[in-house]
Each structure stands twice: as C-alpha cells, then as structure tokens.
C-alpha cells in the first residue's frame, strides 16, 4: 500500500533509558519481540523500562506470512535462559512482565516447560511480580497447558491473529479451532488466570467475520481482547489490505464490550503487550469490584 496514514506515524526510538534497556537486554543475551517483530511501540515502551522478552531463541519453526521473526531450524534450548530472564526482570525493576516465544514445534512439549521455568525464576526473585505469557499453540501437544498452568501465570495470552477464512494465507501451519481450544483449556485448568487474545486488522477481513471471532472468544471465556492494525514488517511479508481508521477501531471496541469482554484494547497501534501492566491492573480491579458486588 501507499505510505502510512498520520495516525500510524511514531517517533524514532531513542533516549537514555531506551539505550539502557537495550544494553541490559544485550548483556543478558536475551531476545525481545519488540526488536524481532519490529514493533512500532518500542521507543515508548523501552523508555518506560517495559520490554517483552522472547525466549527459546530467535528462530521460529513456522513461517507465518505476517511475522518478521526468522524461520528455520532452531538451536537447542539454552538451559541458562530462564535464570537470565529472572535476573533481567529484577534489574529492570518490573512489576509486570510479558514473556513470549518463537514456535518450537521441534520440542516434545513445544517449549511449555521452558515457559514454566522462566515464570518460576522470575517469582523466585520477586514473588509479587505479575507475569503475562504469550504462547504459541504448542500444536495441541498433550500436557503443554497443564505444565504452564502449574506455574501460575497471571495472564495467559494466545493470539488468534486473524479470522478463520484468512488462516491458509496468514497462518498456514496453524488451525483456528486449535487456538480456540487452547484458550478454553486454559480457562478450564487455571482458576483466576485472565485469558487474552488478539487480532490484526487490515488483512482483508470483513466486519462480520471479526464479530464472529469475538463471539467465539467469548464462548471460550476469554477476558481481554486486543485489536490492532497489521503493519507489513518487510516487503517479503503479506501486504496490508487496508488501513483501518481510528473510528472503526472505536466501533469494534464498543461491540466487543457489548459482547461481554471485561477489557478491550482497540486502536491502530494496539499490540498484545502494549500498556500490558496498566491494562492488567484495571482488569484485576474490575474483577475485585465484581466480586464485592457478588458478595
């Protein structure tokens, strides 16, 4: 498409705190989805000392059409990574952290146990840190959700990414209903854990299709919906079909709340981990208020 509209233009990242976070990530030999996915919000987030750690390497076993992460044969798991993640979170002084990963279809459990180890290393240093994880679908491997559930994350995020009709083009190695089933399993197996999912808009989806995905997510008990504009990371990725206007994002937000989501982030630059701490605090306060009313 032609140049981005004004509402998608952001400042070039930089600044003292930004450089401090980048140096710390490099010293700890960690990857971040902020860098690997070319996130437009990296400047704002890193200047607030917010970073989304991407574990299990920087090579993915899949090749989703929208993603900027490298595809290929990944290296063996770095067994020291969970400890380094814990140290980095402690040094950054974070109170809410987001951990994500590449797909690791080569591993027997898809990397679920590695997620669990990262959660435990963070909590070992500060039991009060709240932890949000954004996981792949683990190809539906038996026991993967149970392993992560045992580590008790505060928020479990798995993104559907797009509407079912576009899966063959956008997520050719994933299945829509497998992702829905994972989110349902998380709800069934974890008490008190918030579930979250997101869609990229501007890939050719129709409004009615987005509404149907909202209904499917609510049937799976998902609490939090994120809707953001798809931005083409490189010319090799799938093209942007159109730029969804801020007014349309507001319409989607109103509809999502009407369908029963507890929290909705819907704007052109909304991303899974953007303002994650603030959103989590609001979500937790909302649940507390509802429990008080119920009693």
UniProtKB/Swiss-Prot annotation:
[4Fe-4S] cluster 2 binds at residues 60, 64, 67. Disulfide bonds: none annotated. It catalyses: [[Fe-S] cluster scaffold protein carrying a second [4Fe-4S](2+) cluster] + N(6)-octanoyl-L-lysyl-[protein] + 2 oxidized [2Fe-2S]-[ferredoxin] + 2 S-adenosyl-L-methionine + 4 H(+) = [[Fe-S] cluster scaffold protein] + N(6)-[(R)-dihydrolipoyl]-L-lysyl-[protein] + 4 Fe(3+) + 2 hydrogen sulfide + 2 5'-deoxyadenosine + 2 L-methionine + 2 reduced [2Fe-2S]-[ferredoxin]. GO terms for molecular function: 4 iron, 4 sulfur cluster binding; lipoate synthase activity; metal ion binding. It is found in: Cytoplasm. Keywords: 4Fe-4S, Cytoplasm, Iron, Iron-sulfur, Metal-binding, S-adenosyl-L-methionine, Transferase. [4Fe-4S] cluster 1 binds at residues 34, 39, 45, 273. Its EC number is 2.8.1.8. CDD domains: Radical_SAM. The keyword Mitochondrion does not apply. Binds 2 [4Fe-4S] clusters per subunit. One cluster is coordinated with 3 cysteines and an exchangeable S-adenosyl-L-methionine. Pathway: Protein modification; protein lipoylation via endogenous pathway; protein N(6)-(lipoyl)lysine from octanoyl-[acyl-carrier-protein]: step 2/2. Gene3D superfamilies: Aldolase class I. It comes from the Bacteria. SMART domains: Elp3. Its cofactor is [4Fe-4S] cluster. One of its GO terms (cellular component) is cytoplasm. NCBIfam families: lipA (TIGR00510), PRK05481.1 (NF004019), PRK12928.1 (NF009544). Belongs to the radical SAM superfamily. Lipoyl synthase family. This is Lipoyl synthase. It comes from Anaplasma phagocytophilum (strain HZ).
């Amino acid at each position: 498409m032609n140049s981005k509209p004004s509402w998608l233009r952001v400042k070039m990242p930089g600044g003292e705190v930004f450089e401090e976070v980048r140096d710390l990530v490099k010293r700890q030999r960690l990857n971040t989805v902020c860098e690997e996915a070319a996130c437009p919000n990296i400047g704002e987030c890193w200047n607030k000392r917010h970073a989304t750690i991407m574990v299990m390497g920087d090579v993915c076993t899949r090749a989703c059409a929208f993603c900027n992460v490298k595809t290929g044969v990944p290296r063996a798991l770095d067994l020291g990574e969970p400890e380094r993640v814990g140290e980095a979170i402690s040094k950054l002084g974070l109170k809410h952290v987001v951990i994500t990963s590449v797909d690791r279809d080569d591993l027997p459990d898809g990397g679920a146990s590695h997620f669990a180890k990262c959660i435990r290393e963070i909590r070992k240093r500060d039991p009060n840190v709240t932890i949000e994880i954004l996981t792949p679908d683990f190809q539906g491997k038996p026991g993967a959700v149970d392993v992560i559930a045992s580590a008790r994350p505060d928020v479990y995020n798995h993104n559907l990414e797009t509407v079912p009709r576009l899966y063959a083009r956008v997520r050719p190695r994933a299945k829509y209903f497998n992702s829905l089933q994972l989110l349902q399993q998380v709800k069934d197996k974890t008490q008190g854990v918030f579930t979250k999912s997101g869609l990229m808009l501007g890939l050719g989806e129709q409004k009615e299709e987005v509404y149907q995905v909202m209904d499917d997510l609510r049937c799976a008990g998902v609490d939090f919906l994120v809707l953001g504009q798809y931005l083409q990371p490189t010319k090799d990725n799938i093209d942007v079909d159109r730029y969804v206007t801020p007014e349309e994002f507001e319409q989607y937000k109103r509809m999502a709340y009407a369908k029963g989501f507890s929290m909705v982030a819907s704007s052109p630059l909304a991303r899974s981990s953007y303002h994650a701490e603030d959103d989590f605090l609001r979500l937790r306060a909302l649940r507390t208020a509802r429990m008080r009313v119920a009693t």
